[in-house]
Amino acid sequence: EEMKSFNNEYFKQLTFVKHILNYPWSSAGEDMFFSNLKQNDIKALDYIKNVEDKLENSSYGHDEAKKSLLQIIGKWISNPNSQGTSFGLVGPPGVGKTLLAKSVSEALDIPFAQITLGGQNDGEILHGHGYTYSGSQPGMIIKKMAEMGKSRCILYFDELDKACSKHGQVNEITSILIHLTDPNMNNSFQDRFFQGVDFPLDKVIMMFSYNDSSLVDSILLDRIKEINVSPYTISDKIEIIKNFTLPELKKSIGFDEIDIKITKNIIEYIIENYTMEAGVRNIKRKIEEILLTLNLDKICKKGLFAKNRKSIVLTEKIIKDILKLPISDITDIHLKPEIGIINGLYATTGGSGGIIPIQVFINASSATGE
């Protein structure tokens, strides 16, 4: 009997059927690909080399992470039926954790889906609502798997350390993720919407990103291979700006016909005077602001483009004219020794730090009367 679209249950049952049909139940085809590589050493070597090249070209640095991912590929080739794994990318904001995860997807030519956990406090976002509830939906895990349509894929959970506990109770999200990362249990993941249906997730690469591992549940952390994504050095940032950010922004803005020259010294000047970060987000915004300003001048034929120039060499004066005063204010502190005061160093999980004065003084004690 056909159910009409005006029936209250129509769209709920349609959602149920669509997700069941679109879910990647079998990995036979994907396993066969790696089985063929196992039988041919030359093809296997070419495949690994191709993946390695793609990783190098798509993101700068992160050698430890790339090495770990190549090891997983090696395992898939040696044992095509092998399971996925769980990675934790820990590091300050802006150091390229999400970019790295996406570049892995592109290098392996497998689907990628992102689930943001920041601010979430209910497990329903991951394992859905009970089917009998009005307006119930599957959780994000099954939704994303059905969208990707392949059992070998990447599920990327962003901001793991910012997932909230619910009213002081056991954190539902953490409990679900502990089950998800257990290799003995994740071949039978259950979503509340599908009441008793076991979904295999054992071929999936689970990737988690977080800034502070001390905020992550210890049981969950024990099941994750943690990879430290370190803050960029100034030389790292310079290479990223010259080889990745500048070409990307020029293409995005449509500035390809203009030759923009920026020296390492100028990039370093912008970094040290207009940004305070471990990553490259703010420096990218500053470079973008410079290019957008120059692009508008080019269109209006004013400023540096009053004479229809085809080449621009960025200087400190141009930077100051566009970005105005630097945000960094370098001051000398404690020019002479002072009794009871020393300088200490501080560091934040955001990758920044500095000098902080530490002072020792004595308070009168009410207990002794002194």
Descriptions of predicted regions:
Residues 149, 212-222, 226-285, 296-308:
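Conserved C-terminal "switch" segment of AAA+ ATPases
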Residues 281, 285-370:
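C-terminal engagement/docking regions of AAA+ P-loop ATPases
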Residues 157-199, 222:
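Conserved catalytic/switch belt of AAA+ P-loop NTPases
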